[in-house]
Amino acid sequence: MPVLSIIACKMLEDELTRVLSLDATLRHLILVDNLDGMGLSRKLRAQNRSHLLIDRDEIPDRIKDLQKDDFGKFMKPLLKGFHIIRGRASENASAQEHIVVVNVLRMALHSDGKLIKDEVYKNVRDMSRFSDGILLLYGLCGNSLGDIGNDLRDLSCPIYFLTDRDDKRVDDCIAVALGGNKRYEETLRGFPEVGFFFTPMWAFNWREIEKEANNSSKSQSLGSMLNSLGYQKVAMLDTGLHYTEDFGVESKVGEFASLYNLEIVRLQGSTEIVDRCYQQAKEGKFNRKHSGL
């Protein structure tokens, strides 16, 4: 039973909730038991998606137990009669189940390019030990993760990336929400007065973003920085996902915009990239091991 691990940015929690809750073939879902995964766990429970919360150090043993049980189910019908071995083996191979292991990393990583690189690399190496493939739910993130394919080419399992329809890795989570780099560039050109894009998760966590900005080397809060740079608007991206409590986007974005005297632009988002890349990683369609594209 192959293992697909997902290392995810907390800002893509809603997109991850969608693909995991809609995957009717997924029977074994494990979440790394940490504080940053609690939001995803709550949303999955609300969607009646069963899953296990397991301490990181215990996950390899739990995977072995699941694989052992699966092997027993596979062998039992084969031992009933030699004449059915070929048919049964083929049937079981085509219906082979996956184990999906999800590790949500802390949002504060966004404040420092070196920090995000170090943490993601560490977790990819760590989880590769028990994985047959790793789906990285991060964009390039200011190119902090641009060389990960080459840097970790010694791994024993492939890394799958979030890519747009041109097969290029997406810049960041906003490019993911807009449907790709091309649409992102078009939006930036079409709305030059927009200084920040709010997805539901960014909206829900904007006060924490402000706190991060204040604690970093920046002397200004996010809103004050937008004001000083002359931006007059912020964008609210509606991806159609309403897993975030209250979908606080309208009230949260309105709260932020009012505080800094900014207008709100409403834009249509998309879940296409995460939907497609999750399915492709699960099916192993990308045979380009460790692609750095």
Would you name each region that the model predicts?
Residues Y184-K252:
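A conserved mid-domain beta-alpha-beta active-site/ligand-binding segment of alpha/beta enzyme cores
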Residues L20-L26, D151-D154, E250-A257:
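Short, solvent-exposed amphipathic alpha-helical segments in soluble enzyme
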Residues P2-I6, I99-V100, G133-L135, P158-I159, ...:
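Hydrophobic beta-strand segments of well-ordered beta-sheets in folded domains
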Residues I6-D14, L109-K114, I134-D147, D166-K168, ...:
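Gly/Ser/Thr-rich loops at beta-strand to alpha-helix junctions
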Residues L222-L293:
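Extended, basic/helix-rich recognition subdomains
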Residues N103-R106, L145-E208:
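Long, charge-dense
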Residues P2-H110:
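N-terminal glycine-rich anion-binding loop in soluble enzyme alpha/beta folds
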Residues D118-F130:
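Short, well-structured alpha-helical segments in soluble
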